[in-house]
Amino acid sequence: MTASRDIACRVRGFGAYTPVDVLTNFDLEKFVETTDEWITTRTGIRQRHRLAEGQNASDAATEAARLALADAGMEPGEITHVINATCTPDYLCPNTACLVEAKLGIMGAMAFDFNAACSGYVYGLSMARAIVAAQPEARVLLTATEALTRRLNWADRTTCVLFGDGAGASVITAEGEGALLEDVLCASDGNLGGLLTIGGGTHTPYAKGDPVGEDFFVQMNGRDVFKHAVRNMAAISQDVLARNGLTIDDVALVIPHQANLRIIEAVGDRLGVPAERVFVNLHEFGNTSAASVPLAIADARAKGVLRPGMRVLLATFGGGFTWGAALLHF
């Protein structure tokens, strides 16, 4: 487990982007063997957004980044680092962060991708904080973007109904206005990697003309993912609270990874937090993986649910297996 603590760090701007195209459960009924009732009762999801043809993960990240920069009152040229969380990059090389950097007109920044799946944003906060600790003058743009609908097997109703496309972004600096990043914890267990996979890497390479196999798409052992997700999200949330001398009563709002309503409810039960203090928007966006948490933060602010003065607990889990938690004081 890695931790970042006692390092002054401000999350100054937030932005989120979701594509215009909306795919409802009723739309899915037309070409997937499923129903709105089946999806809603098992997941809580009613719709998800889908990138248009020719639109990629870097495009979504760029739009979210522009909004985050505007929210922070900063110009792209002030950014020194671009770090991007994704498991659905535009290419294996160049990295998506470099593409975002170019689209924003940034020159000379350090830019790289990383993959912590659905835990990406919280992992990114940990990395951004470490960068700021080493270089107090750093101004870090953190993006989290996914184009998951490009990697779904539409014949597998257990996975294709879950995911959507979108992006979120934040600007992190040592000083200035914005939410105080009080603490962040991240952990993983590679022994659980087989529970949630997306193929197409060197383990499952594809040559031109090869038929696309099922292992190219999202594959998931839903039952085991549920069990480990609930256990680890709750445990690391309790850990980050305890190490800061806090209890769940000191948290005004919990923003969990928006994967499945049953998972969110089970984590809330374990933490002993009432449902009205847990932010949920997966019915609108589905599971957007790394983009889920920053998208939820931006949405909660826009809806007036997240207000200045509130302490927020972020809790995530994802393929790898990865998980993390962070405390933000707005």
Swiss-Prot record:
<dbReference type="InterPro" id="IPR013751">
    <property type="entry name" value="ACP_syn_III_N"/>
</dbReference>
<comment type="subunit">
    <text>Homodimer.</text>
</comment>
<dbReference type="Pfam" id="PF08541">
    <property type="entry name" value="ACP_syn_III_C"/>
</dbReference>
<dbReference type="GO" id="GO:0004315">
    <property type="term" value="F:3-oxoacyl-[acyl-carrier-protein] synthase activity"/>
</dbReference>
<keyword id="KW-0444">Lipid biosynthesis</keyword>
<keyword id="KW-0511">Multifunctional enzyme</keyword>
<dbReference type="InterPro" id="IPR013747">
    <property type="entry name" value="ACP_syn_III_C"/>
</dbReference>
<keyword id="KW-0012">Acyltransferase</keyword>
<feature type="active site">
    <location>
        <position position="257"/>
    </location>
</feature>
<dbReference type="GO" id="GO:0005737">
    <property type="term" value="C:cytoplasm"/>
</dbReference>
<keyword id="KW-0276">Fatty acid metabolism</keyword>
<comment type="function">
    <text>Catalyzes the condensation reaction of fatty acid synthesis by the addition to an acyl acceptor of two carbons from malonyl-ACP. Catalyzes the first condensation reaction which initiates fatty acid synthesis and may therefore play a role in governing the total rate of fatty acid production. Possesses both acetoacetyl-ACP synthase and acetyl transacylase activities. Its substrate specificity determines the biosynthesis of branched-chain and/or straight-chain of fatty acids.</text>
</comment>
<protein>
    <recommendedName>
        <fullName>Beta-ketoacyl-[acyl-carrier-protein] synthase III</fullName>
        <ecNumber>2.3.1.180</ecNumber>
    </recommendedName>
</protein>
<dbReference type="GO" id="GO:0033818">
    <property type="term" value="F:beta-ketoacyl-acyl-carrier-protein synthase III activity"/>
</dbReference>
<keyword id="KW-0275">Fatty acid biosynthesis</keyword>
<dbReference type="InterPro" id="IPR004655">
    <property type="entry name" value="FabH"/>
</dbReference>
<dbReference type="GO" id="GO:0044550">
    <property type="term" value="P:secondary metabolite biosynthetic process"/>
</dbReference>
<dbReference type="Pfam" id="PF08545">
    <property type="entry name" value="ACP_syn_III"/>
</dbReference>
<feature type="active site">
    <location>
        <position position="118"/>
    </location>
</feature>
<comment type="similarity">
    <text>Belongs to the thiolase-like superfamily. FabH family.</text>
</comment>
<keyword id="KW-0808">Transferase</keyword>
<comment type="pathway">
    <text>Lipid metabolism; fatty acid biosynthesis.</text>
</comment>
<keyword id="KW-0963">Cytoplasm</keyword>
<feature type="active site">
    <location>
        <position position="287"/>
    </location>
</feature>
<dbReference type="GO" id="GO:0006633">
    <property type="term" value="P:fatty acid biosynthetic process"/>
</dbReference>
<keyword id="KW-0443">Lipid metabolism</keyword>
<feature type="region of interest" description="ACP-binding">
    <location>
        <begin position="258"/>
        <end position="262"/>
    </location>
</feature>
<dbReference type="InterPro" id="IPR016039">
    <property type="entry name" value="Thiolase-like"/>
</dbReference>
